[in-house]
Amino acid sequence: MIHSTPLETPVPNPTFVEKPVDRSWWSRERCILSASMQFPFSTRRQFLSGATLGGSLLYTACRHGGAGGASVDAEALEGPADVTLRIGTVKVDIAKGHAISTTGYNGAVPGPLIRLREGVPVTVDLVNDTAAAELVHWHGQVIPARLDGTEEEKSLEVPAHGHLRYRLTPQPAGARFVHTHVMPMADFMRGTYTGQFAFVYIEPKSNPGQYDQELFLATHEWEPSLGSEEEEEEDEPGLPPATPPPGPKDPNPNGWEIGYQRFTINGKCLGYGAPIQVKEGQRVLFHFLNASATENIKLALAGHQFDVISLDGNPVPRPERVDVLELGTAERIDAVVQMRNPGVWILGTPKADDRNNGMGIVVEYANRKGQPRWIAPPKTAWDYTQFGDNRATPLPQETIPLVFGKINGGKGGFNRWTINGKGYDSKAEPRRLMKGKRYRLVFDNQTDDAHPVHLHRNSFELTNVYGKPTSGVLKDVVLVKGYRKIEVDVTPAEEGLMLFHCHQQFHMDYGFKLLFNVV
């Protein structure tokens, strides 16, 4: 008999005892069986009957999704799921007297913290209580395309008022997350403008070090609206100069941009949620996630510094201490803070307007009270290469230039985005890549916008950032500033469709994506 599982309990600022954080890489994914149908079923016979209708098709689809084989295991579909995500309407009290109605997971924003063990298969239940089909993307995991949760990769969707169950093997270890991958276009009640996101932490197999608290903090913005003002990138000391491409400029003015009224960390505006409680002498491990639809952010903890140990869930070769973290949309940073400065402090964005509208959280030492303090951090450029090493990287077997372009939408219009001169075309033949072959992707940003670009179902290694060679830094999102280049190497680990796109929702919706097919 199949039962719906109890919903995980959401924790606004979860704290845990010491956990192991070592990583191992690239075990093979096995899709056992998937079924898209209404539930619950009252008997095993009814369930298996439903699985026959939906499961046979999905089993075939999984088999072609690059998993390296799949097996039918009816027993795996019985009993409670290991992970349940219920998609539905959520009311979020973000500030005193200010509530947001949105769509989220399991009745909360962020959704439940999902802790999994690397390489241990789990049964996942996705339950959609809304009137529209949904896509659930396991960001940063190496899984078959059919389970990756995108329309472009022909992934399985969760039908309106329906249910989807499948098996997946979590990998690789580290901080990942799960979020909707619906393309909302200008509908700000759908897609990543909503509260459909949750941390996924895949437990590694060995201990990364000592810490006293572990905190998961996700940033998000609310109440988006269209405007004509284009936000310019701030001047950052130490950042190489931008070099706009030669030739005539677009005669049309810039199109619509998106702005927000409210900013939150873990669904609460600064000063409204409970403070983070710490003690002097503690080592606190922070897992940060930029869960914004469109905004790149910076974060600082007044009176303290961050020891960065992982980027996008992957340990860095050379941990470094920094004053400010920068996260493009969908980037994650793991950093340890040594609590050596007793007081009541603000952890938040250096941008005063955004901080005053909520982007921050209070950090309070034991036996300390009073108004939280903010101290502006020094202005320095974020440099990925400081976390890399100097070893030589293997030469790529093929180099693929990817030139990012922009076509201004004009007043009252929407900008269009291109890769190598073309916007995304769902009817175009995907670019073929060979499994196991090392490719160098050259991200050549010829626009004045910063682009957090994301490659699905793989991590890539940074090899050159704004003219500085580097190696050893593995990521799945990298922020390419305006008029600059970043080079990365990737060796596709799984066959099947593989999506590349800008994680800025507005850019992705209006053309900034490309589909590969790994064979």
Model-identified regions with their sequence ranges:
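Acidic-aromatic/histidine active-site loop/patch
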Residues: Q213-Q282, L289-S292, N415-T418, K422
